[in-house]
A protein has these predicted regions:
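Claisen-condensing/thiolase-fold acyl-transfer catalytic domains that form or cleave C-C bonds
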Residues: 75-76, 96, 101-122, 211, ...
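Short, well-ordered amphipathic alpha-helical segments that serve as non-catalytic structural scaffolds
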Residues: 3-7, 46-61, 116, 160, ...
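Active-site-adjacent elements of ketosynthase-type condensing enzymes
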Residues: 79-85, 131-151, 178-195, 242-250, ...
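Active-site glycine-rich loop that binds ribose-phosphate moieties when present
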Residues: 95-96, 102, 109-116, 133-159
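Conserved beta-ketoacyl condensing-enzyme motif
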Residues: 4-93, 229-245
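Glycine/charged-rich beta-loop-alpha catalytic/anionic-binding loops adjacent to active sites
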Residues: 34-35, 65-69, 91-103, 143-148, ...
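A contiguous, well-structured pocket-lining segment that forms one wall/lid of small-molecule binding clefts
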Residues: 26-27, 38, 42, 56-58, ...
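Condensing-enzyme catalytic core mediating Claisen C-C bond formation in acyl metabolism
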Residues: 1-42, 128, 143-212, 216, ...
């Protein structure tokens, strides 16, 4: 199963010096897996650390100390004071910074975070919105032997990303957003809180349902802003899995190389939930000028969300 996933590497915050997470000294050692409380304790420590690493990389490219707003997305843990407050405090940001925490939305939460940042900047042109996505999926390994949950767990790894959204003419400009929820699809992707962490249910029907949805010309017209999908310069598709990327490629009749950025992120990192789309956008940001791009992600609902993007200047 792992060989067919198109994933070469996945990463975890679980300490390497402890050996294999499922070994005798690992986090999952023993017959009984850790309870949810133990997993949340680790999340409270490790999630801010990983988020700060992402912000440090961003800081090498752009100033962040004058951020007026902070938007954080995460679905792999809970802590109060919230991870948004922890990040703001650890970064030394103003105590008056306005914060938004987008929780438990799953893989398309980066769309919601960036969309929220865009709305803030449109209403307050001087705003500088720091956006952070951080996910620790490897804290939620489940002691199961059924094929479907095993396949789901094979997809996910840990990751974090950060971006600054402002009216400054730099980078990519976020355009019109879109969202849709598929009918009778609420059981296809689930993220349930249990006594032993969060349990992922990812139905094998998801790729086919996505392909069926993308066969709707009216929906594709909205997603592609009225253009032929093949005329879009850059498709930033959430790297949710090999079969999901294949479904999007075939349904939209895209060239084989169109989703190379998404496939590269999948191969190097696996599915990092909300952080994944940010990694894909970072690769596109490094390209020469992109005139017409579309970001597209899927998650619980089953829902699809995204936005158009283009040059900021």
């Amino acid at each position: 199963m792992a060989a067919r996933s198109a994933i070469a590497h996945r990463w975890s915050v679980l300490p390497a010096e402890a050996g294999s997470p499922v070994g005798e000294t690992g986090f999952y050692a023993g017959l009984d897996h850790p309870g949810t409380a133990a997993r949340m304790t680790l999340y409270a420590d490790a999630a801010p650390e990983l988020a700060l690493c992402a912000v440090a990389s961003l800081r090498e490219q752009i100033r962040i100390d004058d951020a007026t707003h902070l938007v954080v997305a995460s679905c792999t843990g809970f802590v109060a004071p919230g991870i948004d407050q922890i990040i703001a405090r650890r970064l030394g940001l103003s105590p008056s910074i306005e914060r938004v925490l987008i929780g438990f939305m799953g893989c398309y939460a980066a769309v919601a975070a960036l969309r929220t940042a865009r709305h803030i900047v449109r209403s307050e042109p001087d705003a500088r919105v720091l956006v952070v996505t951080v996910e620790l999926s490897t804290l939620h390994l489940q002691a199961v032997d059924e094929i479907e949950p095993l396949l789901a767990m094979l997809q996910f790894g840990d990751g974090a990303a950060a971006a600054m959204v402002s009216a400054e003419p730099r980078g990519l400009a976020i355009g019109q957003s879109f969202a849709t929820t598929l009918a009778e699809s609420d059981k296809l992707i689930r993220w349930d809180i249990t006594d032993t962490g969060f349990a992922m249910h990812l139905s094998g029907e998801v790729p086919a349902r996505i392909a069926t949805a993308l066969a709707d010309r009216d929906l594709v017209k909205i997603i592609a802003a009225g253009q032929d999908p093949r005329a879009i310069d850059a498709w930033a598709v959430h790297a949710g899995g090999r079969s999901i990327l294949d479904a999007v490629e075939h349904a939209l009749m895209l060239d084989a190389a169109t989703l190379d950025d998404s496939r590269a992120v999948l191969a190097a990192n696996g599915n990092m939930s909300s952080a994944t789309l940010m990694f894909v956008l970072a690769r596109i940001l490094a390209r020469p000028r992109v005139e017409h791009g579309v970001a597209l992600a899927f998650g619980p609902g089953l829902a699809a969300e995204g936005f158009a993007f283009g040059p900021a200047a």
